[in-house]
């Protein structure tokens, strides 16, 4: 890859990647798992990019979406990459480091021959260098072929005794952005009367709290209004319950990191989805934000009209816990 070859590469004043990591290693050692983990951590990831396009990719402006600008970049490269030779790879890395100020590092994933054979046998896949010969021959050839890359790697991880979840945890500890302490959290409020969402990871039923729906002056309001907050907080069960829920979530969410979970939906429900579930969702969201969790909050049923079945029960004068 010569300097002249790159003369047509696009230039841009857009924010370059904050960091560039070249992810390589032995086939079956965990490159795909590593790239998925980097993507979950907010990195931009590209797999099996031809070496001749490395410089062009780095100079290409990122997506116009603000969240993509200046993100770290993880590039998956191995012996199957088009145009890959060790000499070309080493020369390309040297040139990138000369022409770019941001950190450019190499992560090499290693694994024992016996474990690689077990993994390929388990998945019933062929080793890419052993299509017409014994698997151990292909593994040995690739190991020798990539030895010079392994020698200069900035980070070396041996995955022989490492599970997929353990590898994800190790990568997060090593490479997660400084402000990344948790998976993305989505908090949802809804009403049981309109059905339970299918994507909830954790669901808390808040129908045990006193119901502002039965106060005629409060009925038109929602859990976003201070009058509703005051009413719900008067319930002696409120503070002990939400405090225990908060403590449980602060305990669980970091452990989702360790298992590689990058997205979790926490749902709070009442009957109509307008009062109790809304306020509790907001209360919990505020405490999680204080703990520096990245989250979004959605109130599914907040602006929906009262269901006909609810109206009938109210007109019949039954002790129905709506809202």
Curated annotation (Swiss-Prot):
Binding positions for GTP per the UniProt entry: 78-81
Keyword Nucleotide-binding: yes
UniProt-listed Pfam families: PapZ_C (PF22740), RapZ-like_N (PF03668)
InterPro entries according to UniProt: P-loop_NTPase, RapZ-like, RapZ-like_N, RapZ_C
Keyword Zinc applies: no
Chain sites annotated for binding ATP: 25-32
Keywords, ordered alphabetically: ATP-binding, GTP-binding, Nucleotide-binding
Molecular function GO labels: ATP binding; GTP binding
Function: Displays ATPase and GTPase activities.
NCBIfam families: PRK05416.1 (NF003828)
Family recorded in the similarity comment: Belongs to the RapZ-like family.
Protein name, per record: Nucleotide-binding protein ZMO1325
């Amino acid at each position: 890859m010569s300097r002249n070859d790159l003369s047509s590469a696009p230039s841009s004043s857009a924010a370059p990647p904050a960091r560039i990591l070249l992810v390589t290693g032995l086939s079956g050692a965990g490159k795909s798992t590593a790239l998925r983990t980097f993507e979950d951590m907010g990195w931009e990831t590209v797999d099996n990019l031809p070496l001749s396009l490395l410089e062009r990719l780095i100079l290409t402006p990122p997506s116009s979406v603000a969240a993509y600008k200046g993100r770290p970049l993880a590039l998956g490269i191995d012996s199957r990459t088009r145009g890959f030779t060790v000499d070309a790879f080493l020369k390309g890395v040297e040139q990138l480091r000369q022409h770019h100020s941001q950190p450019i590092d190499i992560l090499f994933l290693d694994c024992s021959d016996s474990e690689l054979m077990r993994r390929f046998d388990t998945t019933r896949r062929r080793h890419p260098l052993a299509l017409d010969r014994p698997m151990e021959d292909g593994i040995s050839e690739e190991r020798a072929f990539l030895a010079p890359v392994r020698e200069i790697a900035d980070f070396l991880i041996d995955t022989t005794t490492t599970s997929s979840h353990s590898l994800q945890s190790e990568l997060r500890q090593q490479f997660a952005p400084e402000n990344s302490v948790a998976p993305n959290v989505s908090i949802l409020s809804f009403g049981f009367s309109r059905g339970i969402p299918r994507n909830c990871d954790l669901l808390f039923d808040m129908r045990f709290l006193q119901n502002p729906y039965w106060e005629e002056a409060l009925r038109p309001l929602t859990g976003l209004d201070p009058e509703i907050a005051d009413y719900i907080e008067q319930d002696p069960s409120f503070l002990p319950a939400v405090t225990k829920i908060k403590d449980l979530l602060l305990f669980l969410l970091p452990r989702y990191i360790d298992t590689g979970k990058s997205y979790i939906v926490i749902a709070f429900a009442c009957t109509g989805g307008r009062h109790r579930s809304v306020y509790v969702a907001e209360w919990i969201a505020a405490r999680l934000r204080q703990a520096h969790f990245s989250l979004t909050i959605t109130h599914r049923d907040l602006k929906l009209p009262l269901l006909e079945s609810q109206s009938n029960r109210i007109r019949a004068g039954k002790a129905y816990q709506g809202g």
